[in-house]
UniProtKB/Swiss-Prot annotation:
<feature type="topological domain" description="Extracellular">
    <location>
        <begin position="30"/>
        <end position="147"/>
    </location>
</feature>
<dbReference type="GO" id="GO:0030279">
    <property type="term" value="P:negative regulation of ossification"/>
</dbReference>
<dbReference type="GO" id="GO:0097643">
    <property type="term" value="F:amylin receptor activity"/>
</dbReference>
<feature type="transmembrane region" description="Helical; Name=4">
    <location>
        <begin position="277"/>
        <end position="297"/>
    </location>
</feature>
<feature type="topological domain" description="Cytoplasmic">
    <location>
        <begin position="412"/>
        <end position="498"/>
    </location>
</feature>
<feature type="topological domain" description="Cytoplasmic">
    <location>
        <begin position="260"/>
        <end position="276"/>
    </location>
</feature>
<feature type="topological domain" description="Extracellular">
    <location>
        <begin position="377"/>
        <end position="384"/>
    </location>
</feature>
<dbReference type="InterPro" id="IPR001879">
    <property type="entry name" value="GPCR_2_extracellular_dom"/>
</dbReference>
<comment type="function">
    <text>G protein-coupled receptor activated by ligand peptides amylin (IAPP), calcitonin (CT/CALCA) and calcitonin gene-related peptide type 1 (CGRP1/CALCA). CALCR interacts with receptor-activity-modifying proteins RAMP1, 2 and 3 to form receptor complexes AMYR1, 2 and 3, respectively. IAPP, CT and CGRP1 activate CALCR and AMYRs with distinct modes of receptor activation resulting in specific phenotypes. Ligand binding causes a conformation change that triggers signaling via guanine nucleotide-binding proteins (G proteins) and modulates the activity of downstream effectors.</text>
</comment>
<dbReference type="InterPro" id="IPR017983">
    <property type="entry name" value="GPCR_2_secretin-like_CS"/>
</dbReference>
<dbReference type="GO" id="GO:0051897">
    <property type="term" value="P:positive regulation of phosphatidylinositol 3-kinase/protein kinase B signal transduction"/>
</dbReference>
<feature type="signal peptide">
    <location>
        <begin position="1"/>
        <end position="29"/>
    </location>
</feature>
<comment type="similarity">
    <text>Belongs to the G-protein coupled receptor 2 family.</text>
</comment>
<dbReference type="GO" id="GO:0150056">
    <property type="term" value="C:amylin receptor complex 1"/>
</dbReference>
<feature type="transmembrane region" description="Helical; Name=7">
    <location>
        <begin position="385"/>
        <end position="411"/>
    </location>
</feature>
<feature type="disulfide bond">
    <location>
        <begin position="236"/>
        <end position="306"/>
    </location>
</feature>
<dbReference type="GO" id="GO:0150060">
    <property type="term" value="P:amylin receptor 2 signaling pathway"/>
</dbReference>
Length: 498
């Protein structure tokens, strides 16, 4: 999977700004392709065609003369593709060039060598003609697919932002009330480790939020705006810099999660609280190095419009460390599963139940560590499988923040239990407040009635200061709000400590 998200954004930009094919359906040696004067399209397309033309001329000079018998068509460069010597009456074919995203490199271009040993000439122009119609025959389908992926990205990242912000709010709320118990008795035996785990979660959730916001801005502001890309303002490249930085931070905080879990489970289950500042340096600080190096080299060596092109190996400055982080997390996952299966075997559980737990642990850890991008690295070449691959991979990319928020916050039993306890405490305080208010109103009414009776019988004022009457035996004593809160907090602390 080579720069999947970046390449898709480039393809979508081409389609949204030019839904019709970029190149005409034919080519010949005397024809020079015409491109609209958009620097981004012109530079990329012409540069790749010139490189292919130089390779073709070198090849024609190095190949030996035609060794066959009979008439043949001479080797030639038709403007887009290189053709070898071809016997008369043969339809030569090769794969379509990949100069432009709307050309399908999986389709084929054909060129017919006539019986007279001359390349076929188009009847209208009377010049040699190559059939490139299949190269862009499926452009409307690709355009429709690009629009679907475009809206899938908008919906996925918007939903991820919403759920992640709610999750961060829940973590902040539970942290404020000090209610969040350890997530798992095996993985997190102490309260401090639980707090460290939540801190890692919050940082990773924050990278998801910031990355999704930047991607939405990029898709809404940059991708559909061909005029903006043509002007190539500095803010365009600044946005690209932060996009690459937040993407790197996202994957390196996944690596932080993997390092933390691996240290906790494999190295020492009963380890003391780890130093979190190392994780902050790795998650927030280290991605600045490859991102800054990429920005400098890109500005000097490959300064294309808005840095949208993927036709440069400079992207490996960023994607190389990201790929390394994913591979490391993949091995962490395998080692963690090995330890978990070993512990399940030692507990003498049923074999089916043991493997069910192992599978469940795998499914939970996969989105956290991002190893799905290691398992699905290459796109199939067939159209149907390629389309299925696109939808699966882009769903995982755009909805990953949503999946992580659901699994590690909303579906977490400890988070649910803490929220229920806080809700029950709130209900108890509210109910006690209502009872106290009703009791105060009743006491005020009784005092008013006693005062009216005293005025009627002319009782001295000091008699109103007599001792309060005893409560009837069948009536419950009024409980103050403060008492209820103290008792509830004591019970809650006992449950938490247990």
């Amino acid at each position: 999977m080579r720069f999947t998200l970046t390449r898709w954004c480039l393809t979508l930009f081409i389609f949204l700004n030019r839904p019709l094919p970029v190149l005409p359906d034919s080519a010949d040696g005397a024809h020079t392709p015409t491109l609209e004067p958009e620097p981004f399209l012109y530079i990329l397309g012409k540069q790749r065609m010139l490189e292919a033309q130089h390779r073709c001329y070198d090849r024609m000079q190095k190949l030996p003369p035609y060794q066959g018998e009979g008439l043949y068509c001479n080797r030639t460069w038709d403007g887009w593709s290189c053709w070898d010597d071809t016997p008369a009456g043969v339809l030569a074919e090769q794969y379509c060039p990949d100069y432009f995203p709307d050309f399908d490199a999986a389709e084929k271009v054909t060129k017919y060598c006539g019986e007279d040993g001359d390349w076929y000439r188009h009847p209208e122009s009377n010049i040699s003609w190559s059939n490139y119609t299949m190269c862009n025959a499926f452009t409307p389908d690709k355009l429709q697919n690009a629009y679907i992926l475009y809206y899938l990205a908008i919906v996925g990242h918007s939903l991820s932002i919403l759920t992640l912000l709610i999750s961060l709010g829940i973590f902040m709320f539970l942290r404020y009330f000090n209610l969040l118990a350890p997530f798992n008795a095996l993985l997190y035996p102490t309260r401090s480790i639980s707090c460290q785990r939540v801190t890692l979660h919050k940082n990773m959730f924050l990278t998801y939020v910031l990355n999704s916001i930047i991607i939405i801005v990029h898709l809404v502001v940059i991708v559909p705006n061909g005029e903006l890309v043509k002007r190539d303002p500095p803010i365009c490249k600044v946005l690209h810099f932060f996009h690459q930085y937040m993407m790197s931070c996202n994957y390196f905080w996944m690596l932080c999660e993997g390092v933390y879990l691996h240290t906790l489970i494999v190295v020492s289950v009963f380890a003391e609280g780890q130093r979190l500042w190392w994780y902050h340096v790795l998650g927030w600080g280290f991605p600045l190095i490859p991102t800054t190096a990429h920005a400098i080299t890109r500005a000097v060596l490959f300064n294309d419009n808005c840095w949208l092109s993927v036709d440069t190996n400079l992207l490996y400055i960023i994607h190389g460390p990201v790929m390394a982080a994913l591979v490391v997390n993949f091995f962490f996952l395998l080692n963690i599963l090995r330890v978990l299966v070993k512990k399940l075997k030692e507990s003498q559980e049923a074999e089916s139940h043991m493997y069910l737990k192992a599978v469940r642990a795998t499914l939970i850890l996969v989105p956290l560590l991002g190893v799905q991008f290691v398992v699905l690295p290459w796109r199939p070449s067939t159209p149907l499988l390629g389309k299925i691959y696109d939808y699966v991979v882009h769903s995982l990319i755009h909805f990953q923040g949503f999946f992580v928020a659901i699994i590690y916050c909303f579906c977490n039993h400890e988070v649910q239990g803490a929220l229920k306890r806080q809700w029950n405490q709130y209900q108890a305080q509210r109910w006690a407040g209502r009872r106290s208010t009703r009791a105060a109103n009743a006491a005020a009414a009784t005092a008013a009635a006693a005062a009216a009776l005293a005025e009627t019988v002319e009782i001295p004022v000091y008699i109103c200061h007599q001792e309060p009457r005893e409560e009837p035996a069948g009536e419950e004593p009024v409980v103050e709000v403060e008492g209820v809160e103290v008792i509830a907090m004591e019970v809650l602390e006992q449950e938490t400590s247990a």
